[in-house]
Amino acid sequence: MTAQTLYDKLWNNHVVREEEDGTVLLYIDRHLVHEVTSPQAFEGLKMAGRKLWRIDSVVSTADHNTPTGDWDKGIQDPISKLQVDILDKNIKEFGALAYFPFMDKGQGIVHVMGPEQGATLPGMTVVCGDSHTSTHGAFGALAHGIGTSEVEHTMATQCITAKKSKSMLIAVDGKLKAGVTAKDVALYIIGQIGTAGGTGYAIEFGGEAIRSLSMEGRMTLCNMAIEAGARSGMVAVDQTTIDYVKDKPFAPKGEAWDKAVEYWRTLVSDEGAVFDKEYRFNAEDIEPQVTWGTSPEMVLDISSKVPNPAEETDPVKRSGMERALEYMGLEAGTPLNEIPVDIVFIGSCTNSRIEDLREAAAIAKDRKKAANVQRVLIVPGSGLVKEQAEKEGLDKIFIEAGFEWREPGCSMCLAMNADRLTPGQRCASTSNRNFEGRQGNGGRTHLVSPAMAAAAAVTGRFTDIRMMA
């Protein structure tokens, strides 16, 4: 039998039918639903007189529009409130395996809530009307975002039409240095291959450095696969995966668990499996990263300087660099560790889990917010993450440092709720996109790890965390 990649196995196990041109009907195991991309899909079902094909495949929460402060005031923005209210109504009418509404303890960012509930399991196909659905590939699952029309198709038929991507292996060999996190690995990879480097591919991440990551670190890495242009990212199943899933609310139990684990252990690329493209990186080459421009690929080590467009020979790239520097208000040659920040945001589906908050708290402990930093928002990814952080006293560390301890939600990752930048504000952010206006009109976003964000909060500028005792 021909050796298969992990992607081959996941794909082949879910093909319902294949056409001559390679288009397939792909069966979907788990459908994650939130308030932004579902209203039109539910309306389409109503107009056609259809029901959900499989109610028990749907797990839902409200996240993009929910406020992260003053919950006693409810949702103030009328459009945001309308979207959340419509989701409440649609789930009540159509049903779901589980729904975590606004202000429920289980509510949170969909890509945080799903894994912590055990709704994401190895071997599954997972879709959501959100591009960062690639997060769930960390479990040895095939996960990717879909558009609103595909959300309706999944609801109505439990299938989507798709064509198989090419396969890519990105291996990071060796051990990561102290202070280097999964976020740094993700940004480094994107800096090396570019935001189009993974276009048309499904990426499997491997190598010693990847295997050493916790599940939360792997989720951060796979979350960023879409920023490298890939539709999906994944990590093979190992004991770390199995230990994380065990005893989660929706994980199999008893004999079903034993059978599931037996299957899950096969979800690795076979020896001799051939990938369409491979990259290998040395973990020791990776330093703490900071983006300087308006694309995740515009990223450098913290010890670097803002690049000079005049040194770029490609006229298209040079023009892009010039535009980015103008938007970001930066001068070529400025050391990254001399760039001051106005706002710090620690949260998002990339970096809002308990390990991320511990990482930030370790830097913030016994320190205070720098005088030039206007606000520091700490936004846990879910109510359960918030609860755990408070049990550990992390909230007190943040509050004593002068940071804001918020309620769960997508928050300042994107300007769809009350948390947003104003024109010209510079933000050290643990989110996934630094596009123009992503965090608010005219806002300037620098992507970093939680520890690097916390360091910027207490020093007032981008700082190498390895220099902080």
From Swiss-Prot:
Cofactor note: Binds 1 [4Fe-4S] cluster per subunit.
Co-factor(s): [4Fe-4S] cluster
Enzyme class: lyase
GO molecular function: 3-isopropylmalate dehydratase activity; 4 iron, 4 sulfur cluster binding; metal ion binding
Pathway: Amino-acid biosynthesis; L-leucine biosynthesis; L-leucine from 3-methyl-2-oxobutanoate: step 2/4
GO biological process assignments: L-leucine biosynthetic process
Domain of life the protein comes from: Bacteria
Cited InterPro entries: 3-IsopropMal_deHydase_lsu (IPR004430), Acnase/IPM_dHydase_lsu_aba_1/3 (IPR015931), Acoase/IPM_deHydtase_lsu_aba (IPR001030), Aconitase_4Fe-4S_BS (IPR018136), Aconitase_4Fe-4S_dom (IPR036008), IPM_dehydratase_rel_enz (IPR050067), IPMI_cat (IPR033941)
Annotated [4Fe-4S] cluster binding sites: 349, 410, 413
Recorded catalytic activity of this chain's protein: (2R,3S)-3-isopropylmalate = (2S)-2-isopropylmalate
Keywords, alphabetical: 4Fe-4S, Amino-acid biosynthesis, Branched-chain amino acid biosynthesis, Iron, Iron-sulfur, Leucine biosynthesis, Lyase, Metal-binding
Enzyme Commission (EC) number: 4.2.1.33
Covalent S-S links between cysteines: none
Description of how the protein assembles with itself and partners: Heterodimer of LeuC and LeuD.
NCBIfam families listed in its UniProt record: leuC, PRK05478.1, PRK12466.1
Family designation: Belongs to the aconitase/IPM isomerase family. LeuC type 1 subfamily.
HAMAP family reported in the protein's UniProt record: LeuC_type1 (MF_01026)
Main function: Catalyzes the isomerization between 2-isopropylmalate and 3-isopropylmalate, via the formation of 2-isopropylmaleate.
Full protein name: 3-isopropylmalate dehydratase large subunit
Naturally occurring in which organism (per UniProt): Neisseria meningitidis serogroup C (strain 053442)
Underlying gene: leuC
